[in-house]
């Protein structure tokens, strides 16, 4: 039974996901349905966490827009995601960057990976 479930899940995993980690700046292209039409919405920000594995793996992206911080969580293998672009690689020493929530402005910057 477990083998059947694993096999079905393996078929649904996406292969076009780039390698990204917490601290990286990413652009997430999300398919949004409004009424009867579908469009692609862009969400760019810093990955503050990545958790889970397999089909249930998620990542959270944080961005500050006009002084308001917005965090959005996405399923990595969701069909709603059109694509994920890595804009910048960041150098951090933590897996979960919750401390960024308390920082603002230049203090919230993350160093570039060399």
UniProtKB/Swiss-Prot annotation:
One of its GO terms (cellular component) is cytosolic large ribosomal subunit. GO terms for biological process: translation. It comes from Heliobacterium modesticaldum (strain ATCC 51547 / Ice1). Signal peptide: none annotated. InterPro entries: Ribosomal_bL19, Ribosomal_bL19_CS, Ribosomal_bL19_sf, Translation_prot_SH3-like_sf. Keywords: Ribonucleoprotein, Ribosomal protein. This protein is located at the 30S-50S ribosomal subunit interface and may play a role in the structure and function of the aminoacyl-tRNA binding site. This is Large ribosomal subunit protein bL19. NCBIfam families: rplS_bact.
């Amino acid at each position: 039974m477990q083998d059947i479930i694993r096999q079905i899940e393996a078929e649904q995993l996406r292969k076009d996901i780039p390698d990204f980690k917490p601290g990286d700046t990413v652009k997430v292209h999300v398919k949004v349905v409004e009424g009867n039409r579908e469009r692609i919405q862009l969400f760019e920000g810093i990955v503050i966490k990545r958790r889970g594995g397999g089909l249930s793996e998620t990542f959270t992206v944080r961005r500050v827009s006009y002084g308001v911080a917005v965090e959005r969580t996405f399923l990595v293998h969701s069909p709603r995601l059109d694509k994920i672009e890595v804009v910048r690689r960041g150098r951090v020493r933590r897996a979960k960057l919750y401390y960024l929530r308390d920082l603002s402005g230049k203090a919230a910057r993350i160093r570039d990976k060399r």
